[in-house]
């Protein structure tokens, strides 16, 4: 019975912390960080494939699809109260401009996804350039290095 009571007290404590935002904010910051690292990992894998450093051309679309999926959820990675790590305060101070950058990222990711599926080298090359520029544009304004 004591074990059950202590688990109940611990659960109530977690609920109380979550309702004050103490867990949510830190959790959101970590979630955003790892999500962005995942995007970066897919980009690095794509570069290896395009430079023919690895024999995995058939996996290009897999990585392109993953980035497009992550771009779709990118706005959810920056809820109010989740300031921290590399995210600059300008994200929440200039929400309209930041949203435009996220829209550009999503559009570029979708274009690269289509290009990767086409298999056309010129289209892929152009689309990866656009995707890289969309990442850079946002990072230059909204990410602390």
PLM features: residue spans?
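The canonical Cys-X-X-Cys-His
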Residues: 131-143
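Bacterial N-terminal signal peptides that target proteins for export
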Residues: 1-11
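Hydrophobic alpha-helical segments, especially transmembrane helices
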Residues: 6-8, 33, 140
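N-terminal signal peptide c-region/cleavage motif recognized by signal peptidases
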Residues: 17-21
């Amino acid at each position: 019975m004591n074990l059950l009571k202590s688990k109940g007290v611990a659960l109530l404590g977690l609920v109380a912390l979550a309702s004050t935002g103490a867990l949510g904010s830190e959790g959101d910051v970590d979630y955003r960080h790892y999500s962005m690292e995942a995007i970066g990992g897919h980009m690095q894998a794509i570069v290896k494939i395009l430079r023919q450093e690895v024999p995995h051309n058939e996996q290009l679309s897999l990585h392109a699809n993953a980035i497009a999926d992550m771009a779709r959820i990118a706005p959810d990675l920056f809820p109010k109260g989740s300031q921290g790590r590399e995210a600059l305060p300008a994200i929440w101070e200039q929400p309209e401009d930041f949203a435009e950058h996220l829209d550009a990222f999503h559009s570029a990711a979708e274009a690269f996804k289509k290009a990767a599926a086409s298999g056309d080298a010129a289209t892929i090359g152009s689309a990866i350039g656009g995707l890289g520029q969309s990442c850079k544009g946002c990072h230059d304004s909204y990410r602390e290095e």
